[in-house]
Amino acid sequence: MEHQGTGIFHLGAPFLLKVKQWVGWSWTYLWGFWFLLVIFLLYILRAPLRLKENMNLVILFLNTLTPKFYVALTGTSSFISGIILIFEWWYFRKYGTSFIEHISLAHLGPLIGGGDNTAPNSSQNVAECKVWRNPMNLFRGAEYSRYLWVTGREPLTYYDMNLSAQDHQTFFTCDADETSSNSADTIMLTAWRERDQEKRINAACRAYECDPTSPTALILLAEEKAQTITEAEWYLKQALKTSDDLIRNGASTNGDGKEDTIHRKNTNVCVYIRRRLAMCARKLGRTKEAIKMMRDLMKEFPLMSVLNIHENLIEALLEVQAYSEVQQVLAKYDDITLPKSATICYTAALLKARAVCDKFSPEVAAKRGLSPAEMAAVEAIHRAVEFNPHVPKYLLEQKSLILPPEHILKRGDSEAVAYAFYHLPHWKQVEGAINLLHCTWEGTFRLVPYPLEKGHLFHPYPGCTENADRELLPVHHQLSVYPKKELPFFILFTAGLCSFTALLALLTHQFPEPMAHLAKTSLGWISAPFSLLIQKVEDFFPAHILHQLTRI
């Protein structure tokens, strides 16, 4: 019996689902036919229902009403509409959506729309707003501080610098520093926790005086005290000598927990120094040297892929226009199992666009259609724009750039700023790439009409990016928000209805006779098509058929 009940339930569920879908379909497409059918039945049954007599009574009642009644009626409706408008506006400001629209979509939509009840995995619906270290972050002393001196604007937020302080404590300190025989390690343990920049630099100077070969002290001086990239490179080269010795001496650890901790710290320090040295070489124009250093670093420390050194390599390869080598890097890192980034997606789009953009013409494409290569380029652009929709406005120079933050949010405005800051010249040096992007990027939004609910090639766009980007980007930057929060239709409709009825009430109160004449004229215009339709129906059907129908 239990199995039979289960079988009946499984057989009944598809039937009920089909009935529900049929009802939803009928409400979607047949409401017009039903409306005409009701009008036709009312016309046929006008004699039994005494519609003409009842209509005359209604007209007589309306004729006895004074203008003051209409003023009171419109005033009351305006008052009610105003209350609805205020409530809708409060609800929209608090929850970001219209109350009426929310109720319609959440409760009425499933009843009459026949929507799909299958809910995807919550882990795919809710994207975690994870903050990542910017692989292309600048030097504070040589770049960020100079920007502050020139403009008087803070390039970094407190939240961003606080995240960097946490990263520095993770990379450059360990528990063994508290009991280290080297006083420089103890001083730097305190220096990395210091929030004030001047105090950090002073602490690093004291550690440098105690031990001129302290790698972490030299790193802090290179990052924050050095006023030029050349000076920062000098500090880092001094730190690398000691760091390499520490790595070689600690390679043969006997498995002791303390020694392993120190070795992990020394490894982090060595990787960081070599990476920053490669970035210094890139900034000073020695791009080929920087490429070699990055390749060696990725080869020697493959487990450090979490630092996204490949993004530094891609940018350097684009600088020397080594597009085939860039394609090889993308083939390795543009994998479905690896986290995506704006650098990966937009570089793939740039390489696809490079093959066709020099001969691309929107007029010609509109006439003959897109070739397979052009279609592949457009699809790559759409894929990149879906991943991060903020980037195109920076590449098209519709928004001004600022210095990139030290941390970015994937798919957010902070990542777009960080990407465009370095890659805008690479798009410009490919002739026609900017033009192709300009002609095609907005087509992405037709593929993703509801980005917060459902994506096309990626998960739905996370709704938490706006708040996180506001914490990462400075106040003077105009934040790019996606999708744009436009006022819902119900709020606009309510506001228009409220304003229109209030205007009618005012005009009726000031000019009662002209407004009454205008109302009668308007009603005559509105009823004229219906009167003509009724006359056509009476002419079409024979009189005896209508007479027999009224006798039913």
Curated annotation (Swiss-Prot):
Membrane topology, from the record: Multi-pass membrane protein
Keyword Cell membrane listed: no
PANTHER family assigned: PROTEIN ST7 HOMOLOG (PTHR12745:SF6), SUPPRESSION OF TUMORIGENICITY 7 (PTHR12745)
Residues of the signal peptide: none
Name of this protein: Protein ST7 homolog
Highest taxon, organism lineage: Eukaryota
Similarity annotation: Belongs to the ST7 family.
Bilayer-spanning residue ranges: 25-45, 69-89, 487-507
Keywords noted in UniProt: Membrane, Transmembrane, Transmembrane helix
GO cellular component: membrane
Organism of provenance: Nematostella vectensis
Record localization: Membrane
